[in-house]
Amino acid sequence: MKLTLKRKFIAVLALTSLLGACSLFKNERRFEPAKLADIKQSIVVNTVWQTSIGSGGSAGFAPVYADNSIFAATPDGTVVRVNAENGNIAWSTKLDTKLTSGVGVGDGLVIVTDRKAKAYALNAQTGEKVWDTELSTISTMPPIAGFGKVIVRADDFRVQAFDSKDGKLHWSFVRTNPILSLKTNSRMALINNAVIVAVPTGKLVSLNLNDGTVNWEIHSASAKGPSDIDSVTDVVGQPLVFNDGVCTSSYQGNITCYSIKNSRLTPVWFEPFSSAVGLGYDNNIIYGASIDGTVAAFSLANGQIAWSDQTLINRGLTNPVVYQNYLYVGDLDGLIHVYDTKSGSLVGRFSVGSSKDIVSPLLPTDKGVVVQNGSGTLMLIRAN
């Protein structure tokens, strides 16, 4: 099946303020969310547990699964550790500040950032504050921690590395910023004493954790079009990192997979696919949700499209995730749509109990899929 893409409604991204006054998009029915038809549901999605943790979320408020627990935060300053088996809250800490991102977990710490351009490190076992430190500016990307370092990418695209023990700054990395860039749910990844992070104009870099030097750099998406808006492109979501390769998705760009050998990256394949969220992966298949609502499956080996579906056009989709042969994706009405991973058929639909859009990334675990809904409820769901 040939995958066809449409021009995207950029208002779903941070470019809203630039385009809001333009008459170009007025009365455009083609950007209206698709109405949902009834489907034959062959599976039942159940709530294993749910618990209220705070005041909603946003694209940067991604929960994390570690040590049989779910760590999460909400904008009102609440940070929690929840038992992944039953949803019981192990601890809840209320910081006297407004948070701008979800959690980073590693080295026995839980890291969050706030509107005052500070990072806070909490003890992962008790929730007590260990240290805090100043950032270059606010950060809406979740931090990441490991190998003795806490990494924060601020909204000026500066990457800073702090010591996990005391928050002391070790190094800083920055590139010249473009005129326009996206504010979306990009995330970092750690592998082999390096952090992989998106920087402006569609680039992805691997930085040595010891000193911040560049191990490698790839241009995952190239600017297109005559105007500043047409030329906006950035890597989105969390890159998929394998022992010998990395795959990325980008806005106004592609899904691209590279092989890594001796710190050199070679493109293996790419497929045009504009997305504002990250990729899903399972059993040698990559899953993407495009900016226009297309959901598609690609072969990891060569990028061949296994299936694609356009039932959810313009429904503001989350990142797709897989749990036990089913693909889950959330939308702007607080619904989870479930696909059969082999056929691409919609087999189930589930409301997360809030009509607000699901903006926090879905989180796959070995127990089910974790959802942080727009009303501040954390839940674990799975299909039976």
UniProtKB/Swiss-Prot annotation:
Residues carrying lipid (S-diacylglycerol cysteine): 22
This protein's record includes keyword Lipoprotein: yes
Main location, first listed in the record: membrane
Lipidation sites (N-palmitoyl cysteine): 22
Signal peptide: 1-21
Compartments reported by the entry: Cell outer membrane
Biological processes per GO annotation: Gram-negative-bacterium-type cell outer membrane assembly; protein insertion into membrane
Membrane topology term: Lipid-anchor
Family: Belongs to the BamB family.
PANTHER family: CELL SURFACE PROTEIN (PTHR34512), OUTER MEMBRANE PROTEIN ASSEMBLY FACTOR BAMB (PTHR34512:SF30)
Job of this protein: Part of the outer membrane protein assembly complex, which is involved in assembly and insertion of beta-barrel proteins into the outer membrane.
UniProt-recorded name of the protein: Outer membrane protein assembly factor BamB
